[in-house]
């Protein structure tokens, strides 16, 4: 068998795999349910690695009832928090190193991060909303258990007992609890996490584009030079920040990441060299304020947001709970899929030389 025939055989195997998975691994719609028991949650969703939206859990949260820009500013005041700043709202994403030249080298770019007083973030979001111009995007996305580390003044507004059924189903305690706050410009690029995720939307709407782990062969995960947005302005004051992308040299490294945006048109993805995305199975869902998304471990997801301009917050706000995944048979199957995809890619690259 020639290498080309071998590659075609692999493609055929992937197609058969997806075809057989249609009925039980690939979702075409997402259910909305009321609070389940731990047994129901485990049997119908966790064991099947199946996302679901749960309603009615947050109605008694003080956060859901009272959080507004004014309330949060009054409670947090001059507490310093970590913000991610970018030119385009895309932090931790693959992009051209020269933002004005789409054909320039593609790198994995991290945001410019700095500590500011929370009230400065509120001031910036109000200013950004009024000006409605292409300004810097500020996003609160610090993920190292940020609710407990930087937002502990808000802990009394959250009742984590509403997800006790999830703790029981997962068979573990919460590993990290994170606070998210940002405006419509901020987007999290397509990625996956080794966590079971209970994602609680408090204000606004989170727009998730979900792809099952079985779609891995169609997502072109590759290694890209590590880079960062760097402030080349005269200082870190908001008015003087000027960001440009620079390669990280200390240390120099490559980062494995997915370059594909599943919300782009197929035509654009083909132009970028990603035709296999046509065979993936994306589904876009809206998680509204007061709803909780169960996002299974290893599920690919891209996240955008849409603030409710008539509400008392100009940002979309969410709290999420991470639980360590169980490294069982699903993980073993996924690792096998990764290795076969990697092997096929090596053969393709060999044939190009």
From Swiss-Prot:
Pfam families: Cupin_8. SUPFAM superfamilies: Clavaminate synthase-like. One of its GO terms (molecular function) is endopeptidase activity. InterPro entries: Cupin_8, JmjC_dom, RmlC-like_jellyroll. One of its GO terms (cellular component) is cytoplasm. Residues 138-348 form the JmjC domain. PROSITE patterns: JMJC. This is JmjC domain-containing protein E. It comes from Dictyostelium discoideum.
